[in-house]
């Protein structure tokens, strides 16, 4: 890629608040003071916008939001980030806590740290024991950095001598009603793309991404395609946070936003911008507010806009200055099926190190180490039926247990127990890995195991619990023995592997759960190069938001932008395009049957005057219910006239190509589309989307599995026959008997023929 570069300017104004320490820096030690000096707010910049935020523990603490501190697990923590264009000027920790009634007052206390710097100590008195208490503690904002950790350390005592730190009376409960109150102030930014995608997306911000996209008027197909590609790219950045892209026509945005404009079609606030001579990406401030930035996607025509957004998706590492030009973007290698970066590879075993999301994910320490977790995303159509399991080669290291045959490693998948392995006190065949030894020496273990059924098209969480039995205190009456506890260290080796290779891709469709959780079947190719978006001419802003939100969600699920997606306003183009169809708005005539009697057409229609739906013979209420296809046959059809918003997601087989699918997102008006957009951003409501029809109302999401079932993917004929017979044991037995009889007849006939031939030869002699 070749980029024309603009001038380079500092990303931040020189006029800044008091310095903030980097994430790995420690303040100068204060020998005479047990904690930091009273908080002093950073310098306030006159006129800079300020916002206040309360972070409840229910959202930022580990699930379920409440934290229980114990004698052998005395630490709990929450984490929060600060955007690059903001600084924290005030911080207050609001704690709701209940101490054990068995604690000794004054000797027991709670210490609060920010980034390992002591912020304060709460001494527990006798009036607080066994009761719910509230505490407000000021946090010094000078020690807030871009990534922050507030740690709570419980110091508890229940008797003066011979204490056992594992005693069950040693506890302190931090309630989920606790919160952290923060006041943020905006920082002035220069228009420098060297920090892109900041400020439009900031990885330090854990909130869902909300990025308005602005057009001069209702965009044509080319501008919609460019916006869809860019939305999918921002989705790859937002990942688990979620994302939404409100659409504006000829309006100044109230927050950081993206603006699409050609020389002939621009919003009014860009009329004075000179014409461009090619694809251009530029960062400017809102004319009346320097704290709001706009990312301009400029070009002579729609083709230039497409080139510009592809330059953002694949060449942003070279960005700097206020303005850059994108000369060209060339694709070198086509994407291969199922190679989405967020999915586990299915062409070879995959190392755990490739699945890590942060550096120290596969290690833990403590008297009882916290569980180690690893997320695994699988393609929805992986054919695992009749499979004995997935092979996993596990290598792990751990501190040698004190007691023999009492400590073990428990392995769970999606909160279901898989297997446990004994942590041995002696060396095994992998002891050559001892060069990574930590405290008390490390042992190495290596085991093979099979994994039971996985959730396809969803996030699977593998959890490793190292459970230690430790001798913490002992003795007899009048004679006490105590030990200074030493933390245990555990590591799952990066070279451990999990193998999904060798499996075919085949699944029953339609399956809206695969669409909601994995963007399937469109995500089969990560760049969506076999996907055609069918949109309405002159879409309303809320309809365009539906398209952009959907593309952003697919990008977040695959981890790759939709650089190859096609888009058309002409539904007739779908007849000649061998692609999966994603329809936004009304269904084309070829996909609907107004009589609702054709099971190959859509099983739900939404119109301004009436709605119609088919219902199945037997309805399942659970997405995982593996009911036979006969239960999904159409039992009845109903037509309803009603007021109020309604929306739906409908899946069906493409009438143009047998191996292609259609997913349509429909609504009866602006309120219906708004409701649809909110439901698809809500993880709880999205989990209720399955089957072939998902209806969205104010009450929530209701799904149906109704209509024809078809199959996507490929299975050899013998595997299809075996799979069909495997679900019908009686038929399988009958077929086996028939095969045996036929084999016996053929054998008997062959033997008789051979006998006649021998007798004939004897007669001739």
Label every PLM stretch briefly:
Residues 1-7:
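Bacterial N-terminal signal peptides
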Residues 8-13:
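Sec/Tat signal peptide C-region and signal peptidase I cleavage site
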Residues 14-765:
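Solvent-exposed alpha-helical segments and adjacent loops
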């Amino acid at each position: 890629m070749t980029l024309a570069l603009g001038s380079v300017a500092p990303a931040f104004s020189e006029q800044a608040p008091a310095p903030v320490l980097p994430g790995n820096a420690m303040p100068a030690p204060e020998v005479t003071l047990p904690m930091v000096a009273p908080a002093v707010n950073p310098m306030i910049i006159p006129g800079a916008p300020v916002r206040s935020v309360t972070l409840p523990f229910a959202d930022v603490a580990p699930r379920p939001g409440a934290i229980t501190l114990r004698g052998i697990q005395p630490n709990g923590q929450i984490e929060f980030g600060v955007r690059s264009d903001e600084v924290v000027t005030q911080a207050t920790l609001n704690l709701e806590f209940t101490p054990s009634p068995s604690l000794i007052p004054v000797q027991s206390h709670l210490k609060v740290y920010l980034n390992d710097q002591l912020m304060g100590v709460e001494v527990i008195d006798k009036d607080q024991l066994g009761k719910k208490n509230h505490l407000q503690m000021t946090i010094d904002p000078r020690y807030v950095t871009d990534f922050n950790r507030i740690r709570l350390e419980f110091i508890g005592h229940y008797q003066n001598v011979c204490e056992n730190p594992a005693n069950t009376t040693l506890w302190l409960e931090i309630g989920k009603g606790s919160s952290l109150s923060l006041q943020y102030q905006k920082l002035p930014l220069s228009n420098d793309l060297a920090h892109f995608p900041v400020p439009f997306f900031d990885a330090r911000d854990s909130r869902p991404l909300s990025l308005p996209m602005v057009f001069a008027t209702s965009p044509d197909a080319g501008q919609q395609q460019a916006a869809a590609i860019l939305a999918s790219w921002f989705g790859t950045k937002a990942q688990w946070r979620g994302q939404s892209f409100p659409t504006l026509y000829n309006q100044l945005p109230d927050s950081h936003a993206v603006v699409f404009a050609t020389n002939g079609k621009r919003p009014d606030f860009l009329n004075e911008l000179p014409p461009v001579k090619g694809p251009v990406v530029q960062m400017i401030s809102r004319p009346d507010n320097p704290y709001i930035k706009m990312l301009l996607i400029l070009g002579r025509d729609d083709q230039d806009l497409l080139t510009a957004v592809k330059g953002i998706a694949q060449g942003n590492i070279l960005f700097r200055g206020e303005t850059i030009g994108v000369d060209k973007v060339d694709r070198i290698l086509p994407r291969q099926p199922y190679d989405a970066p967020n999915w586990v590879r299915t062409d070879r075993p995959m190392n755990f190190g490739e699945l890590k999301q942060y550096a120290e994910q596969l290690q833990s320490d403590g008297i009882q180490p916290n569980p180690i977790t690893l997320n695994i995303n699988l393609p929805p159509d992986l054919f695992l039926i009749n499979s004995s399991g997935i092979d996993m080669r596990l290598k792990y290291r751990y501190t040698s247990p004190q007691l023999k045959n009492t400590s073990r490693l428990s392995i769970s998948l999606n909160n279901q127990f898989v297997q446990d392995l004994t942590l041995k006190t002696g060396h095994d065949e992998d002891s050559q890995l001892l060069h990574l030894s930590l405290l008390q020496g490390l042992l190495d273990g290596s085991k093979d195991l099979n994994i039971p059924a996985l959730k396809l098209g969803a996030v699977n969480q593998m959890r490793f619990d190292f459970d230690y039995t430790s001798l913490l205190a002992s003795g007899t009456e009048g004679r006490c023995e105590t030990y200074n506890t030493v933390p245990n260290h555990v590591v799952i080796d990066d070279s451990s592997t999990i193998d999904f290779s060798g499996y075919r891709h085949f699944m029953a469709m339609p399956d809206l759960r695969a669409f909601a959780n994995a963007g399937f079947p469109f995500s089969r190719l990560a760049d969506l190069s076999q996907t055609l978006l069918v949109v309405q001419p002159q879409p309303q802003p809320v309809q365009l938001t539906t398209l952009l939100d959907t593309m952003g969600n697919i990008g977040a699920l695959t981890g790759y932008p939709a650089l190859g997606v096609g888009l058309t306003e002409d539904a007739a183009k779908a007849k000649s395009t061998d692609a999966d169809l994603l329809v936004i708005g009304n269904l084309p005539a070829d996909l609907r049957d107004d009589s609702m009697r054709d099971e190959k057409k859509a099983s739900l229609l939404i119109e301004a005057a009436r709605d119609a739906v088919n219902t199945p013979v037997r309805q399942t209420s659970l997405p995982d219910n593996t009911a036979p296809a006969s239960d999904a046959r159409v039992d009845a059809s109903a037509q309803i006239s009603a007021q109020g918003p309604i929306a739906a997601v409908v899946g069906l087989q493409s009438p143009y190509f047998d191996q292609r699918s259609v997913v349509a997102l429909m609504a009866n008006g602006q309120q219906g589309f708004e409701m649809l957009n909110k439901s698809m951003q809500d993880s709880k409501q999205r989990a209720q989307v399955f089957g072939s029809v998902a209806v969205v109302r104010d009450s929530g999401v209701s799904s149906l599995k109704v209509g024809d079932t078809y199959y996507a993917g490929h299975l050899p004929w013998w595997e299809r026959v075996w799979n069909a017979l495997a679900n019908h044991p009686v038929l399988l037995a009958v077929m086996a008997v028939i095969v045996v009889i036929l084999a016996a007849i053929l054998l008997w006939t062959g033997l008789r023929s051979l006998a006649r031939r021998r007798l004939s030869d004897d007669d001739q002699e």
